[in-house]
Amino acid sequence: MLVTDDRVDIWVGDQSPQETRHSASRITGIPEENVHLHLCHLGGGYGRNGNGPQAEQTILLANQNRGTPIHMLWTREEDFVSTTYRSMGVARLRAALDEDGWPVAMEVKTAMDEKAPGSTAGFDVASRYFAPNYRFSTHSVAFHIPVGTRRGVGAPAMNFYRESFMNELAHAAGMDPYQYRRELIARGDLPYKNDMIKALDMAAEMSDWGSPL
């Protein structure tokens, strides 16, 4: 990174270049049109290059040493303690099943960090598996820990909530988890449900589902 009196040049792997340009302009006082990002292929980001503090720290150092190129590289230990953490959250899912084991109602409650994308958690369950009745509620909680987008934003947590719950429902219904999921998808009216069924069938076939371990 190089900051002069009238220009900023940044070489970085960045998933949010506009935010980085804005930060550079704010810190240095140099107009955004004179902030130049040179995006580099620097390995995977997995979210950490989306809104982490690493670019701003380098901008601060370069601004204090104008005219001198600055290359900042964290050690692995610094990386763990100096950047943002994965957002936290908890979820409670409940369902009422009919006499055949199929859900007639589902309730999804989530509590996630106020900066986490928790508002979609309930919809994420409903967008996969059919039930005639749903109730969603999401609560934002301040954990006072710097968090950022990591490993697919909110998808990993929501997938864990949803699929763990589906396994529990299939077990309570005495059904095969794969067939249980397949039927619930088929009962829905999503325009892409056929693609979801094909993907599920393919996963079952590739994993040799149902064979002894």
Regions found by a protein language model. Name each.
Residues 1-213:
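Structural alpha/beta core scaffold segments of enzyme domains
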